Regions:
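Catalytic core of DAGKc-family lipid kinases
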Residues: 3, 29, 77-188
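Glycine-rich phosphate/pyrophosphate-binding beta-alpha loops
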Residues: 133, 137, 191-205, 269
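ATP/nucleoside-binding phosphotransfer catalytic cores, i.e., glycine-rich phosphate-binding loops
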Residues: 15, 177-179, 184, 209, ...
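Gly/Ser/Thr-rich active-site loops/lids in small-molecule metabolic enzymes
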Residues: 148-156, 200, 206-227
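Glycine-rich beta-strand-to-loop/alpha-helix junction loops that act as flexible
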Residues: 8, 62-64, 87
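A generic structural signal for short beta-strands and their flanking turns/coil linkers
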Residues: 169-173, 186-188, 211-216, 250-252
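ATP/NTP phosphate-donor binding region
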Residues: 1-59, 69
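Short Gly/Thr/Asp-enriched flexible loops that form oxyanion-binding sites at enzyme active sites
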Residues: 67-80
Length: 291
């Protein structure tokens, strides 16, 4: 049996209509499905847990990166197969997984695909599937949250970028990778990447792979404020890792410390003083999309 988990506000309400189409497609395969609607923070995880305990062998998540993150966390080391149907604004995990942009095409491509085990990250015990980190991109997300009451999603994000560009300051961080020596650095951005993209397509970790058993740890040290606007086109193209602007290290564990630091966890913002990351290799069962 399939569980179809949907964030009803995702995609301006279009996600619910999409969930009905997905359920009809499952029925056409001769399979049963149950629809679970999320209603708030943490509800996707609770609904996923209930679905698996009810005997669902496949879980379809319709939503953005935040909902996908919650569902994936509950499916770590479970027998259920995870299907992702992009229904958010950024859809960065869907990019990393090379899913078609069309939601139904994305679902069909996974139905036709071969089983695959992908890695999952954890930060202080909380799961993420794509990217976590701190710095410039998090400052933009914080500003976006402030502006959402005035502007719709994408417009709020664009205005937040322009606002943060003019005032962003690097943060002081302590970093330890795979239990090695602790370094003290002024950082513009630090990303612990399982996937490749943040912010709706910025290729912050262009060489990251979801199933290689490693994080790509991307560190951009402090850069002059006048050069910060140049980071955006570099991130979009993935050039920052090619020209020496960023340091990239492959790792299985990372510890980052900074006083009163805000960390992005697949779009969810958390305030911590220490973030300890560990990779769970091959923890989530999926179907590799057949394109």
């Amino acid at each position: 049996m399939f569980a179809v988990i949907v964030n009803p506000v995702s995609g301006g309400g279009e996600a619910v209509r999409l969930a009905i189409r997905i359920s009809e497609r499952i029925a056409a395969m001769g399979q049963e499905s149950r629809l679970f609607e999320t209603s708030g923070d943490g509800d996707a995880a609770r609904q996923t847990r209930a679905a698996v305990e009810a005997g669902c062998e496949a879980v379809v998540c319709i939503g953005g990166d935040g909902t996908i993150c919650e569902v994936a966390g509950e499916l770590c080391h479970r027998d259920a197969t995870f299907y992702v149907v992009p229904g958010g604004t950024g859809n960065d995990f869907a990019r990393a997984f090379h899913l078609p942009k069309d939601p139904m095409a994305a679902f069909e491509s996974q139905l036709a695909g071969e089983p695959i085990q992908i890695d999952c990250g954890r930060m202080n015990g909380k799961s993420f599937l794509n990217v976590s980190g701190s710095g410039f991109d998090v400052a933009v997300l914080e500003k976006t949250e402030e502006l959402k009451a005035v502007y719709p999603g994408e417009k709020a994000y664009r205005k937040a970028v322009l606002s943060v560009l003019g005032r962003y300051k690097a943060f002081e961080a302590e970093l330890s990778i795979d239990g090695g020596e602790t370094t003290h650095e002024a950082c513009t951005i630090v990303e612990i990447a399982n996937g490749q993209c943040i912010g709706g397509g910025m290729r912050v970790a262009p060489d990251a792979k979801l199933d290689d058993g490693y994080f790509d740890v991307v560190v951009v040290k402090k850069v002059p404020r006048l050069l910060i606007p140049l980071l955006l086109p570099m991130f979009m193209m993935g050039w920052h890792t090619k020209i020496g602007l960023a340091r990239v290290t492959r790792a299985k564990t990372v510890t980052m410390r900074a006083k009163n630091m805000t960390v992005n966890l697949d779009g969810k913002l958390l305030r911590v003083d220490e973030a300890h990351y560990e990779l769970l290799p091959g923890a989530v069962r999926m179907k590799k999309p057949r394109l």
